[in-house]
């Protein structure tokens, strides 16, 4: 790394960590119903929404009612977005006259945005109208993020409360999250992005002449269906427009990741400068990191929140260092051709290698899935870093809400295993960890992984799925594994060599996204409900301290062991084999 890259990365981390505590404390006040600096402005809006929707803010829910509310709300969201996509050609704000989506693509896209995955089997600038982008996709960026945060807050209450079955009110949590957290920060973020050159308009697409016409041979079929080429001359180009900045801010803040354009955050209209790149990474990481502080405040043990933050940050830092190192080493096959230096294929020069690596780690360590570099163009070991971060469950630091509750499931497993090793009843924050909590934690941690391995195996023996791969061999397997890992873990990024707009991937991918989103969410709510009913057990001499460095290291070891046991065979056949092949000169 150059001195500039060291300075850039260090300043970014210092700024990010500086806002973790105040942001975490602010969110704790919001979800505990305490007064904040935004209360004079937003409390009337909040109360009005409750009256319109018939919500009793003082009525709380047990875990079953909370889970049902989550599922029903997301079902309603799915129906609304599916209808918008299927009726796109009849709705306003469609200056390019885009047709309706096919039902398979509409199904996949609606589920994708409802589950916070934002997997896109289409190109935004050539398929989605402005109405679809704003009323459909951008709105769901807010509510899907709010859903994940609400579930995390309910889980925190499960650890904090004693001898009660109540976890809060989903409608209140979601409303407060949207009004007090997501909307204000998104507004500020959008204004900053506009200042950097991100576009925000509802203009028609612009057709402009090229300075010099381009002539090339385009493949086509003759009258008998035989492949031939035809000479084509291009004299002008169409430049897409749209309300990008407003969607870009919540896309990153809510760890959604669905791009307005096909190139996502590598597109100069979404991410034009190194400053906008750092702003977007900051938005991606802000809430996942700050929620650890919120957790510490709400359970009355801030050291515990910092311990969890430390594990997340260490895993992310190691991933960044490894990715930066292997990409700096370059590709030996390219070096043989006389092109030495770092691997800059698929990366934006305006961001540099460090900016690209940091964005890659941030977007796959969370459930964001936005991309500022082409993951398919990373070296084999470089590509294994984002793939590995996704497969581990996106806990470094994870998506908004989902990252924290998945990490807490790992904490429960780590406490349980450590308790068995020292012959003590496992306890965490004064709550005994028993069989029910372990089962729910295992479901939370392994649900997505089971889906990934099963569907990847099915894909490798299905002709349509195999034909969708652009690459054979180990890299082709990596593309398939990455696709299902991304969908099942609600990430949304991809190795772009895979054609995902075929029935196999749109339908089975939809199933993967649903299971990966809602199975863990319901499981952790059940765990939280069980914990909330338990009495508090004061710490004794035999209690394992979970807010110290030894336990933090033990937690990270448990995470890596679970990930290695689950996915090492698949990774061995994919990126590891590809790396050895590359070293062998093939």
Curated annotation (Swiss-Prot):
<feature type="transmembrane region" description="Helical">
    <location>
        <begin position="279"/>
        <end position="299"/>
    </location>
</feature>
<feature type="transmembrane region" description="Helical">
    <location>
        <begin position="67"/>
        <end position="87"/>
    </location>
</feature>
<keyword id="KW-0633">Potassium transport</keyword>
<dbReference type="GO" id="GO:0005886">
    <property type="term" value="C:plasma membrane"/>
</dbReference>
<keyword id="KW-0406">Ion transport</keyword>
<feature type="transmembrane region" description="Helical">
    <location>
        <begin position="442"/>
        <end position="462"/>
    </location>
</feature>
<dbReference type="Pfam" id="PF03814">
    <property type="entry name" value="KdpA"/>
</dbReference>
<comment type="similarity">
    <text>Belongs to the KdpA family.</text>
</comment>
<dbReference type="GO" id="GO:0030955">
    <property type="term" value="F:potassium ion binding"/>
</dbReference>
<feature type="transmembrane region" description="Helical">
    <location>
        <begin position="11"/>
        <end position="31"/>
    </location>
</feature>
<feature type="transmembrane region" description="Helical">
    <location>
        <begin position="381"/>
        <end position="401"/>
    </location>
</feature>
<feature type="transmembrane region" description="Helical">
    <location>
        <begin position="551"/>
        <end position="571"/>
    </location>
</feature>
<feature type="transmembrane region" description="Helical">
    <location>
        <begin position="403"/>
        <end position="423"/>
    </location>
</feature>
<keyword id="KW-0813">Transport</keyword>
<feature type="transmembrane region" description="Helical">
    <location>
        <begin position="507"/>
        <end position="527"/>
    </location>
</feature>
<feature type="transmembrane region" description="Helical">
    <location>
        <begin position="306"/>
        <end position="326"/>
    </location>
</feature>
<feature type="transmembrane region" description="Helical">
    <location>
        <begin position="179"/>
        <end position="199"/>
    </location>
</feature>
<dbReference type="InterPro" id="IPR004623">
    <property type="entry name" value="KdpA"/>
</dbReference>
<comment type="subunit">
    <text>The system is composed of three essential subunits: KdpA, KdpB and KdpC.</text>
</comment>
<feature type="transmembrane region" description="Helical">
    <location>
        <begin position="351"/>
        <end position="371"/>
    </location>
</feature>
<protein>
    <recommendedName>
        <fullName>Potassium-transporting ATPase potassium-binding subunit</fullName>
    </recommendedName>
</protein>
<keyword id="KW-0630">Potassium</keyword>
<keyword id="KW-0997">Cell inner membrane</keyword>
<dbReference type="GO" id="GO:0008556">
    <property type="term" value="F:P-type potassium transmembrane transporter activity"/>
</dbReference>
<keyword id="KW-1003">Cell membrane</keyword>
<keyword id="KW-0472">Membrane</keyword>
<keyword id="KW-1133">Transmembrane helix</keyword>
<keyword id="KW-0812">Transmembrane</keyword>
<comment type="function">
    <text>Part of the high-affinity ATP-driven potassium transport (or Kdp) system, which catalyzes the hydrolysis of ATP coupled with the electrogenic transport of potassium into the cytoplasm. This subunit binds the periplasmic potassium ions and delivers the ions to the membrane domain of KdpB through an intramembrane tunnel.</text>
</comment>
<feature type="transmembrane region" description="Helical">
    <location>
        <begin position="136"/>
        <end position="156"/>
    </location>
</feature>
